[in-house]
Curated annotation (Swiss-Prot):
<keyword id="KW-0448">Lipopolysaccharide biosynthesis</keyword>
<comment type="function">
    <text>Involved in lipopolysaccharide core biosynthesis.</text>
</comment>
<dbReference type="InterPro" id="IPR006598">
    <property type="entry name" value="CAP10"/>
</dbReference>
<dbReference type="Pfam" id="PF05686">
    <property type="entry name" value="Glyco_transf_90"/>
</dbReference>
<protein>
    <recommendedName>
        <fullName>O-glucosyltransferase LpsA</fullName>
        <ecNumber>2.4.1.-</ecNumber>
    </recommendedName>
</protein>
<dbReference type="GO" id="GO:0016757">
    <property type="term" value="F:glycosyltransferase activity"/>
</dbReference>
<keyword id="KW-0808">Transferase</keyword>
<comment type="similarity">
    <text>Belongs to the glycosyltransferase 90 family.</text>
</comment>
<dbReference type="GO" id="GO:0006486">
    <property type="term" value="P:protein glycosylation"/>
</dbReference>
<dbReference type="GO" id="GO:0009103">
    <property type="term" value="P:lipopolysaccharide biosynthetic process"/>
</dbReference>
<comment type="pathway">
    <text>Protein modification; protein glycosylation.</text>
</comment>
<keyword id="KW-0328">Glycosyltransferase</keyword>
<dbReference type="InterPro" id="IPR051091">
    <property type="entry name" value="O-Glucosyltr/Glycosyltrsf_90"/>
</dbReference>
Length: 318
């Protein structure tokens, strides 16, 4: 009951905070990026350097570019679905001139756009600079549940729940749904007749396990953020997609335990960390520290505004 209320309150706060963005005229919503970034300039040098490093990772553009005349403008950006993407982007666009043009792509972005666009996700690959990352759909992807249970007090199994539509998820479940070290299953109704079908399991219950699997779906795995913020150990194959969390910068053996793409080493990895729990706790500490950089609203705003400022500085006027 507490978890359901916690998640619902998280959503309610987001939509109440942002509802006016879809109702009021853009001119009434306008704020000044320059004024906000003056506060950034007064921040400690070490913090400014860390933020600037993130900015150039999210926005790797280095050459001027054009957008078509049909590209939307800040003053003409009507409400769109999914609304969570719209609200996150609108909350940032309000800091820039009303006539400023931009381009954005909502949803799971798994290819590189032809023209520079603001996106939630992108492939981890070279030459992905046209996919400029922002913290979009944050209400879903940055939902974190408090975990007060120490690693050694948790169940010594690996847990996973989700929808298994993709081949790699199905293959995993076919191989491990009966494994004694695993409590894994597909919760989607379409899998009801499959031997790997399981009932829904809340985040709170999943956090009672020492090991939690993060499996990418169409793009990034939604559970990766809350796993890495918890006292459980994240196991996953090397990520192929990234978001504001900078999954492409995560280091195997430092922030998470990397599995082979065929999961053949899953049992070996679990047994290793059962023998050496201090090694698991060291990785968990690093993961929590990684997640801490996304926790301060002021820092997150400065970072996003600088990402957008760089984008607009390279956009050629018509």
């Amino acid at each position: 009951m507490w978890e359901k209320c916690h998640r619902q309150w998280h959503k309610i706060k987001f939509y109440v905070k942002h509802a006016h963005l879809g109702l009021l005229p853009p001119a009434w919503l306008a704020k000044s990026a320059a004024a906000e970034l003056e506060r950034f300039e007064r921040a400690p040098a070490e913090l400014r350097a860390a933020i600037e490093n993130r900015v150039h990772y999210y926005n790797a553009l280095s050459q001027p570019f054009f957008l078509p005349e049909t590209a939307p403008r800040v003053c003409h950006f009507p409400r769109q679905k999914p609304s969570s993407y719209y609200y996150d982007l609108k909350a940032l666009l309000r800091y820039f001139p009303l006539e400023q043009r931009f381009s954005a792509q909502f949803g799971d972005v798994t290819t590189i756009p032809e023209l520079p666009q603001f996106v939630k996700s992108r492939p981890i690959t070279k030459n992905n600079e046209n996919a400029v990352l922002l913290k979009l759909d944050s209400v879903r992807h940055f939902y974190l549940y408090p975990d007060r249970l120490p690693f050694r007090a948790k169940k010594s199994q690996l847990v996973w729940r989700g929808a298994a539509h993709q081949n790699h998820r199905i293959r995993f479940l076919e191989h491990f749904h009966q494994h004694p070290l695993c409590d894994v299953g597909c919760i989607h109704a379409r899998s009801a007749a499959k031997p790997y079908h399981r009932e829904f399991m809340s985040v709170k219950r999943q956090l009672q396990y020492r090991y939690i699997l993060s499996l990418e779906g169409n793009d990034v795995a939604t559970n990766l953020k809350w796993i890495m913020a918890s006292n459980s150990l994240c196991l996953m194959p090397a990520p192929r997609y990234e978001t504001w969390m900078m999954e492409g910068r995560l280091q195997a053996g430092v922030h998470y335990v990397q599995l082979r793409d065929d999961f053949a080493d899953l049992e070996e990895q679990i047994l290793f960390f059962e023998r050496y729990p201090e090694a698991a706790e060291a990785i968990i500490k690093n993961a929590q520290q990684w997640m801490s950089q996304f926790a301060r609203p002021e820092t997150e705003l400065w970072t996003a505004l600088l990402v957008m400022k760089k984008y607009f500085s390279l956009l050629e006027p018509q």
